[in-house]
């Protein structure tokens, strides 16, 4: 069973302290033989956040080859399983743009936003709307689809 993230976890993982914690967790093997020692180290340094850190790093590793920029994503096991492969999402976005130039696309089950990321990168898509019943997944989705100050 995978870890269930909270909105508080998302806020921590995107904070300066959380980003440093993710760097630390990423430097650990997080394999079956090392897991007890790795958990102990993370718990000693980031008590209360160790499970979220381990889930994020192990999911990032599994997402390589499936999701663009996997090394920077916040993912749960369930979200990773349900996320559309970036190549497939890119092809779908291109097809929507070709068939419906200037479209505003609504992904009603956007989860962590894998398809929305590709839609926002595709010329000819006028806008995207994402919705989901899970507030944690929406919080994660907003990280990847909201314009940043430098955009």
PLM features per residue range, with description:
Residues 136:
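Conserved Rossmann-like nucleotide-cofactor binding loop
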Residues 141:
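Conserved SAM-binding loop
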Residues 112-125:
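Conserved SAM-binding loop of SAM-dependent methyltransferases across substrates and taxa
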Residues 127-132:
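Conserved SAM-binding motif I beta-strand of class I
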Residues 2-100:
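S-adenosyl-L-methionine
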Residues 144-151:
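Conserved small/polar residues in nucleotide/adenosyl-binding loops
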Residues 110-113, 133:
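Beta-hairpin (beta-strand-turn-beta-strand) motif
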Residues 102-109:
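Conserved class I S-adenosyl-L-methionine
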């Amino acid at each position: 069973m995978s870890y269930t993230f909270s909105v508080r976890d998302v806020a921590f993982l995107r904070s300066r302290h959380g980003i440093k914690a993710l760097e630390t967790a990423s430097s650990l093997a997080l394999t079956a033989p090392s897991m007890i020692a790795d958990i102990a180290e993370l718990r000693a340094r980031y008590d209360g956040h160790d499970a979220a850190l381990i889930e994020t790093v192990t999911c990032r590793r599994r997402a390589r080859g499936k999701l663009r920029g996997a090394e920077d994503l916040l993912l749960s096991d369930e979200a990773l399983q349900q996320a559309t492969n970036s190549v497939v999402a890119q092809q779908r976005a291109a097809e929507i743009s070709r068939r419906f130039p200037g479209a505003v696309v609504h992904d009603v089950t956007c989860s962590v936003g894998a398809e929305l990321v590709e839609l926002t990168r595709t010329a000819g898509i006028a806008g995207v709307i994402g919705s989901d019943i899970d507030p944690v997944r929406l919080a994660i989705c907003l990280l990847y689809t909201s314009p940043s100050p430098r955009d």
